[in-house]
Amino acid sequence: MSFLYQNNTLKIFLSLLIFALQGCAVAGSVLVPLDSIEPPKGRYSIGTKVYFWTDTSRSEVYTTDPSDFRELMVQIWYPAKGGNNYQKAPHVTFPDKAISTISKAVGLPANFGKHGTQLVSNSVGGLEPINNETFPLILFSHGDGGLLNQNTSQVEELVSNGYIVIACNHTYNASITFDKDGNTILYKSNISWREQAQYHKKYYTNMLINYRYQDLSFLLETLKQE
């Protein structure tokens, strides 16, 4: 029988993630307002944008549909102008849908992590970038079952000190991601634990690492065209 998230290690990771978001949000709402979390120490304001890019040169190996191309949810953080009086972006993209979906996937009530949806970042969506300076670019790649914004605090600290950071959810290898229509895509959804073990044995070392490299290369090539 095939169940969603049969990978027990991933279940533990996601459960800890939900508990962490829940705990941080509850503690934060009592000890300090969620919109006044200490900002990064650098001198630059932080802008961020989310994109959905499709690599039409690569078929999606995680699905059996031959017309399915590799689609990535991408986020960029960059030094920006102003930003002090603008509404900050949520810590997790699509927080309500993301947290409720993960909660249900690990067997918790859908509204369990609702406090986590209140967490905000120190970035402002769509803020005007600084164009008269040059900044080093950092590529961030999450771990197995991770998320592109799992290290948002560290990313924002870097950006506030003059870096640009770009990251993507490695689709089907991230715990959760979204397509351009806002539909959720889970970690190897509908693959049983036995099937996952065989899948990992066949593909993980040789294919998955190379596929991640191709994801990041695609980000760089697309970024040049933006």
Q: Residue locations for each model-derived region?
A:
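Divalent metal-coordination and catalytic microenvironments
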Residues: 76, 158, 216
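Alpha/beta-hydrolase active-site loop
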Residues: 172, 178-226
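Domain-level recognition of soluble alpha/beta enzyme cores
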Residues: 28-138
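Short substrate-entry loop that stabilizes the transition state in hydrolases
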Residues: 120-135, 140-178
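Sec-dependent N-terminal signal peptides
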Residues: 12-20
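Bacterial N-terminal signal peptides that target proteins for export
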Residues: 2-13
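A structural signal for well-ordered alpha-helical scaffolds and beta->alpha junctions
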Residues: 44, 69, 151, 209, ...
